[in-house]
Regions:
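Alpha-helical multi-pass membrane segments and their bilayer interfacial helix-loop junctions
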Residues: 1-259
């Protein structure tokens, strides 16, 4: 709590990311891992989120949403990397980090669509700051390695989810004359991959995160799309119908408990 307060109050003092917090966070993560405490693991995972939010507030325009996406991808990927290890302590700690990272990724994806859409036709930069993008790519690498080591298909879909979210930044850079449907499609595809990942691994937090992200992206698209109210309503109805159909199909793959 003290480290989070220390880091967040720097928002009013300097604009540079507070990298010293990362050292404190790593120390806390090491203690949570050594204690093998699930409560401590949750606290450590939650503590990372305010730092990324405070750091994102320093960024101009839509870049703040991209920073949040990169932070969520790093937290999610690092968690999956630890969850793929054979040790019970590391696996349990990684599962907690991955759960919080997945939910953060879903929320950040919706914010990215809404915020980037507002700045699409302006001269504001639409992309990831290099240092933040490095964190997002690291999260993707961790997930790919975890999928290769564990041979779990759910991890592969999780890697696809992170990759599609990161690719969305490249699609925003194109700045088409009309609507950036490619960027929208990448974000929706990323959230579907997140849902499928949770279903294949029977991890409900990941399933919930995927549906939260899907709803957030649809809401962001509805907000960002320019045009008549009728056109937005038609898109929202179409997206809602697709979500119902998709949930019906995927629900058949959910693990069933014994009666």
């Amino acid at each position: 709590v003290a480290a989070c307060t220390w880091s967040c109050t720097r928002v009013f003092e300097v604009r540079d990311p507070h990298y010293a917090f990362a050292l404190v966070w790593l120390l806390a993560a090491g203690l949570a891992l050594a204690w093998n405490s699930r409560v401590a693991a949750h606290l450590v995972a939650i503590a990372a989120i305010p730092w990324w939010i405070a750091t994102a507030l320093h960024q101009p325009g839509a870049e703040s949403s991209f920073v949040l996406v990169d932070g969520a991808a790093l937290l999610f990927g690092a968690g999956l990397g630890l969850a793929a290890l054979s040790g019970e302590r590391a696996s349990s700690f990684g599962a907690v980090l991955a759960a919080h990272g997945a939910i953060s990724l879903g929320v950040a994806a919706g914010l990215e669509v809404a915020m980037a859409g507002d700045f699409l036709h302006s001269s504001v930069s639409l992309g990831h700051p290099p240092w933040a993008l490095a964190g997002g790519v690291a999260g993707l690498v961790f997930t790919v390695v975890a999928a290769f080591v564990s041979r779990r298909p759910g991890f592969g879909y999780a890697a696809g989810s992170i990759g599609l979210v990161l690719l969305g930044a490249a699609a925003w850079q194109v700045r088409p004359g009309g609507e950036p449907w490619l960027a929208y499609a990448l974000q929706l595809g990323a959230m579907v991959c997140l849902v499928v990942s949770g279903i294949l691994d029977a991890v409900r937090p990941r399933i919930v995160a995927g549906w939260i992200g899907f709803a957030g992206v649809v809401a962001g698209i509805t907000w960002a799309v320019k045009g008549s109210l009728l056109g937005r309503s038609a898109f929202l109805a179409l997206a809602g119908g697709a979500a119902i159909a998709l949930s019906t199909v995927l629900n058949r793959r959910l693990p069933r408990g014994r009666p």
